[in-house]
Amino acid sequence: MEEVEKMLHKGVSRRSFLKKTGVGLGVAAGALMFGTGIAGAQTQGGVVPESPLPYVELDPEEARLRAHAAYFRSGCAYATFYAIVSMLRDKVGGPYNQIPLRMLGYGRGGAASWGPLCGTLNGVGAAINLVAPDADVNKVLGDLIGWYTITPFPSKESNDVAVANGYKYDTKAPISVALAQSTSNSPLCHASVASWIKESGFSASAPERAEHCGRLCGDVAYKAVMMLNAWKAGTFTATFKVSDETAGCLSCHGDQQVGKMSCTSCHDAH
């Protein structure tokens, strides 16, 4: 893992990375190929199975720290995916060593900075999908998305780590103050960022906004690991329920749309 970390920081060429990690050049065309009847990634150790990969209990606080630092390397989706998969590399190894951590880099800013689904949810969704069967992915990720929409970010815990200069993996100069909190009422990147900008008074280009998103990455990675640990232990129970307001909207408009988002985050109530 240490060697991989060094290469990620140095930005080595793809060919050099493949050579040093032992991944065959044939894998470069598609590190993981999905779909019925299509073989998984070819590696020196064989074929990476399409069935869920092994999961072991992880440290959620370590996930917070890794995700925060990784955000400043390649964005939010990368950060939360990296936090979980890098720890599984450390504790499980095997197939996780053949999954390129940069594959979620496209998800920054909701996907190429277009602002749809928050990249933090995209990243943890990909990680959850690696370890859980489809039915459980929907349960765990669905509950996580619901939690995201109603939770003030950054959390007090993330702010406290910053004030204590506890983000030990960061390579940038720290912002060691508590930041304003906001609740998005939406899983969308642009809604989340806009609500925080309105609450904090900072602009989208301010270092504090980037720090907000870094702490948000930590919060979401932390929560995802907590939920995955409970899922692994057989104790996970989904708790999120749509609001009465949203349920009322869906009672009339449920056949006219797909989703569980708060309707009034985009539409006027009527």
Regions found by a protein language model. Give the residues of each.
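A short glycine/serine-rich beta->alpha loop
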Residues: 65-74, 106-115, 204-209
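Beta-strand segments within the central parallel beta-sheet cores of soluble alpha/beta enzyme folds
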Residues: 97-106, 138-149
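Small-residue-enriched, tightly packed secondary-structure blocks
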Residues: 75-133
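C-terminal segment of N-terminal export signals and the immediately downstream linker at the start
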Residues: 34-65
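Amphipathic alpha-helical interface segments
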Residues: 83-87, 128, 141-228, 236-240, ...
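The canonical Cys-X-X-Cys-His
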Residues: 247-255, 260-270
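N-terminal secretory signal peptides
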Residues: 1-13
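N-terminal export leaders
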Residues: 13-34
